[in-house]
């Protein structure tokens, strides 16, 4: 129609084409769909008939399965990389965001007809030399009764304490008390800055040798590495079990080492990757100095870039545009994260036939993924725009008082604590409201806890920071509750409760006749029906935009309308059931339950 309007102009469109449009919309397959079809200027005004809306709401009510599923993305295969914890480290609060966002994005793609592979990319290789060395070096010094997983975390704490002290430039009087305590227990010879720096150098050198042996396939190192990885994976499963989340594949980055190495070797032979020589570095430095002279770069920016250039000399890099480069192998020939990430692109494309590679990782990795995707294109791993690559990033957890980013050590480093706090909060609030037993209360508390965490993460811009008051988790969970997850769950529970009451009382639901003809919907009923009917479109839109907030906001809209509607429009009155209100309630229950399922939230029997 816009083409006809543009071609003939408004006068011709109004005189010739608009009457034809009005006629088509008033008969044939559209007969009974619209109660009013009129023309005003160049516009056709349509009003859906009450009978058609009631029929359509009935189809929503009777839908078998997850309402809203479609085949809009049936020609696409998504590999979604999310959660991605580090072996030998404790899960921190940020892993909640990655896990929830990635899992629900996967559900959205799946509900829209795509083939989806959910991949937990375990960081099980990079930096593991420190773990292997620490496990042997400090084996006799761990506290009695400390389990294997806590030993791995303790090794990481030792390493970080040593790095902070050695790099801090202060003698013992200026050390953080926690760091000083760790070093006193495990490295008593470290008493001043000089001894700390010497110990750090030895530990790093020994760890590098361990990693080189692991990378070369040394049997003893590989066996210990496998055992320690298994310990970490078992601890991660406790977190995933509590969230009720599973993956199609749990794959360590080590899987991609050989593929990444082969890609780099091929690129060197083809010239798409080069060894970053001092000559190349000097050329880049000259270019940077020219920018400083031209006033387009500050002296501080130059110094930072110059340090990065000096660090990269001797490394294998993929030259990028804008004078940037992507380091894929260290100067000493050792692999790095980038080596394995390049291998992952190739394997995921070949093994899964991926048309889309989605990485759900925090915003601190934006530069890395930008360069990874550009390098993959240069290396021929992306051809004709396929696979599509997307980094879905999210904001930091920040201190509720200072607004500063929380580190793993300072924040809720044990994710189980945050989930347990949410569960306890809701269980306490439900204990005097649910007449059922402890199992029913626990199920409802779990649903509300997960629902509040999910909606808090998804309702707003994913890039926004999330405030955590680590001194008062109850306050944080209370804020999460206000995000709306509990409100949507309440609407679904209320709708299902009304339906159950009709069934339990053996009440009959009167016939609607020919699709509800003769019943006049009020404006709120018509709006509710429209929102229910457009839910499938919102699911697809959320999937296409890789933005769960599109669906979450629509769910909140439906819940808001229904919670207002049922309080004024009784479904049951004097043992008589209003059939239209009953069907709208059925449709609401089905739609919200389905949408909540996509958001990984179960609807409890009562709250």
Regions found by a protein language model. Give the residues of each.
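Non-catalytic interaction-recognition regions
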Residues: 1-54, 65, 72-607
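Short, charged, solvent-exposed linker or helix-capping segments at domain edges/interfaces
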Residues: 55-60
